[in-house]
């Protein structure tokens, strides 16, 4: 990431085709050592490309990635999922009832003033 950021800094600073020397100079200014293999890889991937286009492509790819930890699961129509789903639903209702009871007992913070 540091190499990409340095490349972008150089490109946004007016250098349309930053070299390894340019990127190393940026990294050295903040005390970061450069790995030549990774640096060469970044330069070869980005060299000759329009930075705005690369950023736009990246934003498009990030938009397609699910975020927030939500799991997207879909059952195929006509599958056995609804029949199998009734047992976990009943267990889930029992868990909810137990959870509600425990929440009520926690309202008084365990002191039981009116018990």
Swiss-Prot record:
Question: Which residues lie within the region annotated Disordered?
Answer: 76-115
UniProt keywords, alphabetically: Acetylation, Phosphoprotein, Ribonucleoprotein, Ribosomal protein
Q: Which residues carry this modification: N-acetylmethionine?
A: 1
Stretches of Low complexity bias are at 76-90
Positions bearing Phosphoserine: 17, 19, 79, 86, 102, 105
Report the GO terms under cellular component. Answer: cytosolic large ribosomal subunit
**CDD domains cross-referenced by the UniProt entry:** Ribosomal_P2
**Subunit field text:** Heterodimer with RPLP1 at the lateral ribosomal stalk of the large ribosomal subunit.
Quote the PANTHER family the UniProt record gives: 60S ACIDIC RIBOSOMAL PROTEIN FAMILY MEMBER (PTHR21141), LARGE RIBOSOMAL SUBUNIT PROTEIN P2 (PTHR21141:SF5)
Do you know which HAMAP family this protein is assigned to? Ribosomal_L12_arch
What is this protein's function per UniProt? Plays an important role in the elongation step of protein synthesis.
Which protein is depicted?
Answer: Large ribosomal subunit protein P2
Gene that encodes it: RPLP2
